[in-house]
Amino acid sequence: MQRSECSGGVQLRNRATGSNDQRTSSSTQMKHRTTVQRSKSSSLTSSPEAARRARPRPSDKLNPKTINPFGEQPRAPTAFAAIYSQGGIPCRLVHGSVKHRLQWECPPEILPFDPLLITLAEGLRETKHPYTFVSKEGFRELLLVKGAPEKAIPLLPRLIPVLKAALVHSDDEVFERGLSALVQLSVVVGPSLNGHLKLLLTSLSKRLMDKKFKEPITSALQKLEQHGGNASLIIIKSKIPTYCSICC
């Protein structure tokens, strides 16, 4: 009787031991699989192909990041982007093999400057393509039409604060577009710009301390003097005493 009980106890212990061995073996296999998967994942991440994808390519500069103005945006669009996507700007960007251009829905000569010119000036603060190109080129082409001075001069009180916003922008490219637009405007409106110069010269004076902007700002000031006359020179010198006149 004792032998039977002993034999039964041994069998139970053997079964328990076998079950423990199976669980231990199963756990070891799972750990091994996890280690292999992590190893594969690590090797894929550190592979030469992944490294090539992470490095920027020279062609990235030639193909700026573009937003689809008609697609879903991850964040609320700017005022200019919203107007453009709704067809409020009567022109579209045409991509060329060498350079881009604007295609107007109707001749720019018949378009009202109010509010189109101001809207394009507001777009100068955009930082993404195609808005940057559309605003800059649209502003330039609109000022080239016949009768531009008569259309632009009445808008100066509303246009100047918008240009100033571009000139005080922290983005260097936005500042450069604002500076270029200011020169284009001075060519068209001439001395009519003099009454608004003081509002703009403060931001130019601050940027003038940056070496990379010294030459383009000096050139812009010379254009302002050229088209604004002697009165503009007095205003420029009052805000930027170091400015050297083109008459010197």
Swiss-Prot record:
The keyword Kinase does not apply. InterPro entries: ARM-like (IPR011989), ARM-type_fold (IPR016024), Parkin_co-regulated_protein (IPR019399). Residues 1-72 are annotated as: Disordered. Keywords: Acetylation, Phosphoprotein. Residues 14-29, 36-45 have a biased composition (Polar residues). The modification N-acetylmethionine is found at M1. The modification Phosphoserine is found at S47. This is PACRG-like protein. It comes from Mus musculus. The gene is Pacrgl.
